[in-house]
């Protein structure tokens, strides 16, 4: 399938820092509108940390608008549904079916894909669209000046070498949760959640218990959860174990948090109260590597002149809504769309465009960050709160769950509009009521 090129941004020079999913998506979306895009990634190669990620219909529609669906579907997997199960007894408490009704309601499908496969597709197509991508280069600073923005770069491999200052029209900082550019706006640090993740992939066909898996399954329980779904057309089984580290909590209380909180010894202890099926799965994970889960506080301002923070640099979320990658892709499409619209109208002013993008994106992304934290609380409650949570999920299963997902999945970054229940811009009232009721039971 050929990519959908246009030329509204021809002659516009843009620098992107960060070669993850958001940065590569930004390079692609802007190059497809004719912009002269250069991306700098500090690492020696384009590489994503982790294994699988989930793309809801809000991401599907963007990939479709970029002409990538054929490649994405071949590389990924289309699950039949998402099942929430109680981690203590494996009871299914909610099934979200990705059937024809779902597809018609949201105008898209639900897909899971290996992070490296998605990044490779974005990088390959960004270069095919004309973007220039470079590894081993760090963007160190920027300054808005008359007629543009100066961007300082240097070698990230041989520090202090190959220093240059480039003058371009706009600078987009997709430089991740440990963003260099964020420091120009606020002196803060990532917020540790006290939770840690272990991941692993294996051959699905060789797993007798899981070889017929066609779903995304999330086991949720007191202070833990465990995720399973197929990848690469059903070739791989992706599994993720996430639990709250007692060593982190004890260290925080004592004022001395150990660097290795969440180690494998804690992993085994954390699931003692879970169904034996889950406990037996822990040995299949990559036990030599674990990820301490952090997010960022929502920012009040993402922009300085012609520089805009985007992706995890601006709004790193926790993983519970499975929307971090899609949020970054939404950012990318918003910049390209708003700039192309302004250019088509003959009034392209990059400071105004980036301010408009921020005004559109910041409330939504802050909401996803905030609701993501609550969603994690809801997954991990214990005691009476767990029983209430389970009944709430059962009721959603019986009464229809679209109303709880429309605010997230109904957003279409390629059309500046929600396609389903646009009035649900805030966290639905029912979710707020659940939160208060559940947390009172702790």
From Swiss-Prot:
Its EC number is 1.14.13.24. InterPro entries: FAD-bd (IPR002938), FAD-dep_Monooxygenase_BioMet (IPR050493), FAD/NAD-bd_sf (IPR036188). One of its GO terms (molecular function) is FAD binding. The keyword Metal-binding does not apply. Homotrimer. Optimum pH is 7.5. The keyword Translocase does not apply. Disruption phenotype: Cells lacking this gene show an altered growth with 3-hydroxybenzoate as sole source, but growth with gentisate and other aromatic substrates (benzoate, 4-hydroxybenzoate, and protocatechuate) is the same as that of wild-type. The lineage of its organism: Bacteria, Bacillati, Actinomycetota, Actinomycetes, Mycobacteriales. Belongs to the 3-hydroxybenzoate 6-hydroxylase family. Coiled coil: none annotated. PANTHER family: GERANYLGERANYL DIPHOSPHATE REDUCTASE, MONOOXYGENASE. Keywords: Aromatic hydrocarbons catabolism, FAD, Flavoprotein, Monooxygenase, NAD, Oxidoreductase. One of its GO terms (biological process) is catabolic process. Activity is reduced by the addition of 0.1 mM of various metal ions, including Ca(2+) (16%), Mn(2+) (20%), K(+) (30%), Zn(2+) (64%) and Cu(2+) (83%). However, the addition of 0.1 mM Mg(2+) enhances activity by 16%. Catalyzes the NADH-dependent conversion of 3-hydroxybenzoate to gentisate (2,5-dihydroxybenzoate). Is involved in the utilization of 3-hydroxybenzoate as a sole source of carbon and energy for C.glutamicum growth. Displays a high preference for NADH over NADPH as cosubstrate. Is not active with 4-hydroxybenzoate, salicylate, protocatechuate or benzoate as substrates. This is 3-hydroxybenzoate 6-hydroxylase. Its cofactor is FAD. Signal peptide: none annotated. It catalyses: 3-hydroxybenzoate + NADH + O2 + H(+) = 2,5-dihydroxybenzoate + NAD(+) + H2O.
